[in-house]
């Protein structure tokens, strides 16, 4: 027991250390390098009219916070979905939930921009949430008829392709200016984040994460089976609805602000469980949030510095590091069944 507790404490300290290091690199490294002295002077309020102040305060700090918040949200969303479906390869990207959110956001974005209207953060989140719930509805209908998770995943991928195809069809008939805006968003990126957007995503992500953490005990009971959860007084029907609602809000918030981001929701929860050496939700949920923040900060740093000033899409980088984890999980799972 003491060894397990010590391991969890060390794991949390490691993630916090990596988070601080990556945050420091994120604000200092880029097309324009900023020294520690520059950052210290800017944060103290000196020389607010300088280019360095604009780069740090208006570009890098909001982007840093967005990557951390949305990375944590996506990882937590993945863990909730894996709990709901009782399978480690469930996630918002694989099940087509992110693509559904992307489709509805694209439709609303083209509608707003086509009429010369400003599309605020609230409209983006509501559109993404509607898309997430529609896709989740299709997945749940299929899940009732299909017992094999592999078939459900294939169906989720097909839903993702259908949503992407419809999105491409809609974009074909959109105005050129709308296509540029939609293309930049649909590639997946934390760039262009403003302080107003950071405030909105904080107001959405933090309360939903806290609610998810408060569900740690019923999640722990549910992981041992529905009958066991009922014996402890858990209203399973309401509990499952809450899981769907919370995971959809988190994934919708990510899609609304950063576009579709792949593999974070699948890979990070599994890596966190291995790192902490436990599957207890009271440990894994905050671990997932920290792990997702670290993973997305690292991926964002790679995406904007590897070929600077050209930026890669965030999904390209997360796929490179996340897909091998998923492959390893599937091979390991197949080997365990033999």
Please state what every model-predicted region is.
Residues 1-338:
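Alpha-helical transmembrane segments in inner-membrane proteins
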């Amino acid at each position: 027991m003491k060894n397990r507790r010590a391991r969890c404490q060390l794991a949390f300290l490691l993630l916090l250390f990596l988070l601080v290091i990556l945050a420091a690199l994120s604000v200092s490294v880029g097309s324009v390098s900023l020294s520690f002295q520059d950052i210290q002077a800017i944060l103290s309020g000196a020389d607010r009219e300088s280019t360095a102040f604009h780069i740090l305060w208006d570009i890098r700090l909001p982007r840093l916070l967005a990557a951390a918040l949305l990375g944590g949200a996506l990882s937590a969303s993945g863990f909730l979905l894996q709990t709901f479906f009782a399978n480690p390869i469930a996630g918002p990207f694989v099940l087509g939930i992110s693509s559904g959110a992307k489709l509805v956001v694209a439709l609303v974005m083209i509608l707003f921009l086509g009429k010369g209207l400003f599309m605020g953060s609230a409209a983006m989140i509501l559109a993404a949430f509607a898309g997430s719930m529609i896709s989740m509805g299709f997945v749940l209908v299929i899940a009732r008829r299909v017992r094999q998770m592999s078939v459900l995943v294939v169906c989720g991928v097909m839903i993702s392709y259908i949503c992407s195809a419809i999105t491409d069809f809609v974009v074909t008939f959109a105005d050129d200016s709308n296509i540029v805006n939609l293309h930049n968003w649909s590639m997946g990126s934390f760039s262009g984040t403003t302080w107003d957007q950071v405030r909105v995503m904080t107001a959405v992500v933090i309360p939903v994460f806290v609610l998810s953490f408060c569900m740690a005990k019923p999640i722990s009971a549910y992981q041992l089976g529905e009958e066991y959860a009922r014996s402890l007084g858990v209203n399973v029907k309401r509990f499952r609805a809450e899981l769907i609602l919370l995971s959809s809000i988190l994934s919708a918030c990510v899609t609304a602000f950063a576009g579709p981001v792949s593999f974070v929701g699948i890979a990070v929860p599994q890596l966190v469980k291995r790192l902490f050496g436990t599957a207890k939700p009271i440990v894994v949920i905050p671990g997932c949030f920290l792990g997702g923040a670290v993973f997305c900060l690292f991926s964002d740093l790679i995406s904007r510095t590897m070929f600077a000033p050209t930026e890669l899409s965030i999904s390209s980088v997360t796929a490179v590091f996340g897909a091998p984890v998923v492959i390893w999980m599937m091979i390991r799972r197949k080997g365990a069944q033999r």
